Amino acid sequence: KSESNPTAWQNANLQNGWSHHRDYGNVQFSKTFDGIVYLKGTCKGGKTTRESIIFTLPESFRPSTTLFKTALNNDYGSAVLGIYPSGNVVVKGNVDATWLNFDNVSFKI
């Protein structure tokens, strides 16, 4: 496989009341061979309190430092996420439980 071919997409194990929004695709993650992690899909209905865990990435997908990323909320605005070296993907701000989309979230590990 070349570096541009990502690993197979894996479904995220959602936590704190979040569920996959099947109309817009399950929340999933993948990684290229050169270490870029991609997230995609949409979830709904979960806890929106700051620092609430949405899901946890497996060890080989985790950043070495804390990252702050933007996802898309129900108002088509920026929802702020934290992605920790522990693998926890957490709510930071402007997250709406109606739905939360990860299609534009990526980072290098």
Language model segments and positions:
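Extended Gly/Ser/Thr-rich low-complexity repeat segments
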Residues: 1-2, 48-62, 98-109
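Glycine-rich, low-complexity segments
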Residues: 1-22, 106-108
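Beta-rich globular "head" domains
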Residues: 16-71
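Hydrophobic beta-strand residues in large extracellular and virion-surface proteins
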Residues: 12, 27-29, 39, 81, ...
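Helix-rich interaction surfaces within compact, conserved domain-sized segments
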Residues: 67-109
